[in-house]
Amino acid sequence: MTGDLARMSEMPGPDAFLRAVPLTSGIAGFAAPPAPIGVVYAIAGSSSRVLLDRASIGALCDDPDSVVAAAGQVGSQVKMRVGTTWLVANVRSLKLEDNAGTCIAAEIDFLGEGDEEPLTGNLDRFRRGVTRYPMPGCEVFPITTADLQQVYAAEDRANITIGTVYPTTDIPAALYVDPMLGKHFALVGSTGTGKSTAAALILHRICELAPQGHVVMIDPHGEYAAAFASNGALYDVSNLQMPYWLMNFEEHCEVFLTSSGSARQFDADILAKCLLAAKAKSRLGQEIAKLTVDAPVPYLLSDLTTIINAEMGKMDRAGDTAPYLRLKTKIDEIKADPRYGFMFSGMLVADTMASFLARIFRLPGDGKPISIIDVSGVPSDITAVVVAVLARMTFDFAIWSRNEPQRPILLVCEEAHRYIPAGQEATSAVGRILGRIAKEGRKYGVSLGLITQRPSDLAEGVLS
């Protein structure tokens, strides 16, 4: 019994495990954890600074783990231990800190945190956000492939895989679809960096995940037709057949008015009066008790020019007819120009809004949930109006059907800076409607995707 008591007194106390050497250091098959490569120098909520030892980083270049070997590079990640938690941060910039060249200062942005796995010391159960920041002087470590797998692990939520996480070859790069579309998204980059390829891949994956979804892509250069030949409906000037009467009054003004300054307002008043009279002559217009100039009511362009002529005949002085002549001349030019036939053909007056929306929004989808609207053949002076009508129809359709089962729609605009340039988003119809979708679209199930090579030229309010 005395021997048993003696042996019991030799058993480790509760603190012995804390003082013990990590189990992995004595078990074959477990790699020793990487040594620290620097220390935390300054901490701030938005951006922090660490000092990296150049020699320590150089010693990792030949590490068999490609993630560890890339430690310290711009775009790589580092980690810091706070209690039993690992904090993970992105390296944003680097510069030499001393004349000897032994110390590198790095600006970092925190990604999130995860628990420290007791056996291996690796990162576990990563989550976005930081609850406790490290103190200056805290050691900085390189992350490993196992850590990176935790950072980019896809949870049990709808996601699409678009590639692998660099510098690994086996960690899938996944995007959560609902957060991406619910908050809108933008693809930005200089010419030749692969924006169009990335956009095509993302849209393909979304269509595979949700084949009954609805995607409308505005394609200004005819780049996407080949990419979606099998699962997309392709529309260009030969088959778009967008009825001109779908335009609201603001869009009519952008197409028909050629004047500026005070004369433009006078011309707009004349157009409003004549346009309302032309819509009132149609059968549908006669059935509407309170017809407005914005109502999408079919009307004949010939009726509009006839009414303009009649109003012009009431003028006493020849000089007073100039605004009417400007309007009539512009309308006649558009009617006679075959380039505008996709929108201003007299045959389109018989179309209905329901049939046009069903075609563009793929209702039903018939295995082709995406519509590619190729506007490369559209005359440049009305391209913005065509995009404005499509965007407004998308938003209005979502509002009109909000009491029905929701049909989420994704509207993607390539070369977005052409339609919503910085400082001018409030002066054009397309700028206003895309801005409204960016601010309010998610309430009604409309998502907006913007692709641009000039983010600085894009309206700041929309991009934010």
Language-model features: locations:
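Conserved beta-strand position immediately N-terminal to the Walker
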Residues: 185, 373, 449
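Basic- and hydrophobic-enriched, low-structure N-terminal and domain-boundary segments
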Residues: 1-188, 404-407, 422
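Glycine-rich phosphate-binding loop of nucleotide-binding enzymes
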Residues: 159-242, 458-460
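Conserved ATP-driven motor cores of ASCE-family P-loop NTPases powering translocation/secretion/packaging/pilus
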Residues: 258, 429, 436-440, 444-464
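P-loop NTPase motor domains
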Residues: 222-228, 232-233, 244-436
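Loop/turn-to-beta-strand initiation segments
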Residues: 212-215, 367-370, 406-410, 443-449
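Conserved catalytic network of the ASCE P-loop NTPase/AAA+ motor domain
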Residues: 178-180, 206-211, 363-365, 400-405, ...
